[in-house]
Amino acid sequence: MFNLLNTYITSPLDQFEIRTLFGLQSSFIDLSCLNLTTFSLYTIIVLLVITSLYTLTNNNNKIIGSRWLISQEAIYDTIMNMTKGQIGGKNWGLYFPMIFTLFMFIFIANLISMIPYSFALSAHLVFIISLSIVIWLGNTILGLYKHGWVFFSLFVPAGTPLPLVPLLVIIETLSYFARAISLGLRLGSNILAGHLLMVILAGLTFNFMLINLFTLVFGFVPLAMILAIMMLEFAIGIIQGYVWAILTASYLKDAVYLH
């Protein structure tokens, strides 16, 4: 473990490296797609945690639920009310399961990434931006399916003077296409920057405390600051999951109601 800690201190980006934990080899076909990597392992862990939260911590027919159940119901109601407020109408419930699942996946993945020596799924921009592109494509297909060519009226704001229409169409089109990247980039860059900051500060503090006895004692001051930053990262992980859910619901509203 000391070697792993020293590796993270000297090279902070190594914590995001995808390593192969178990792999199959064959002289005839490529079996690399079946390898168990840190990325696939932590994805499985996140899915198992989410499943366990809603299967093992049930009410067992009790009138008053456990604290775990009450906290889960609070999260469920929060996302449900947000979805209803953002999308509105009669069909908001059709999209709620997807939004809630996305929130829980990002929320749990961010919390697990705060465990020392763990792996941050949402810090990998290729994965998280790919997920945002899939959501963007789904919204676009939904809008075209529901409205046909009328969907493109989304790029012309109501009441726009005719001379300004070409300029605003270009701006709105660029803004719409930017959603595909910005949704994932916002989350990935926040998690990536936060984890890098913690590792760099922890490495500096660790090396400082090893100098002599005085620095060992005085080093607890920056160590307390690092713990405060870690608590802030916990909050950012939760907030970023909620922001993802809000923006997904907002983009769905544009696709469904064209406003």
Curated annotation (Swiss-Prot):
GO biological process: proton motive force-driven ATP synthesis
Keyword Chaperone: no
Bilayer disposition of the protein: Multi-pass membrane protein
InterPro entries tied to this protein: ATP_synth_F0_asu (IPR000568), ATP_synth_F0_asu_AS (IPR023011), ATP_synth_F0_asu_bact/mt (IPR045083), F0_ATP_A_sf (IPR035908)
Transmembrane segment boundaries: 36-56, 92-112, 125-145, 150-170, 191-211, 216-236
NCBIfam families for this protein: ATP_synt_6_or_A
Role, per record: Mitochondrial membrane ATP synthase (F(1)F(0) ATP synthase or Complex V) produces ATP from ADP in the presence of a proton gradient across the membrane which is generated by electron transport complexes of the respiratory chain. F-type ATPases consist of two structural domains, F(1) - containing the extramembraneous catalytic core and F(0) - containing the membrane proton channel, linked together by a central stalk and a peripheral stalk. During catalysis, ATP synthesis in the catalytic domain of F(1) is coupled via a rotary mechanism of the central stalk subunits to proton translocation.
Subunit-level organization: F-type ATPases have 2 components, CF(1) - the catalytic core - and CF(0) - the membrane proton channel. In yeast, the dimeric form of ATP synthase consists of 17 polypeptides: alpha, beta, gamma, delta, epsilon, 4 (B), 5 (OSCP), 6 (A), 8, 9 (C), d, E (Tim11), f, g, h, i/j and k.
Protein name per its UniProtKB record: ATP synthase subunit a
Organism: Saccharomyces cerevisiae (strain ATCC 204508 / S288c)
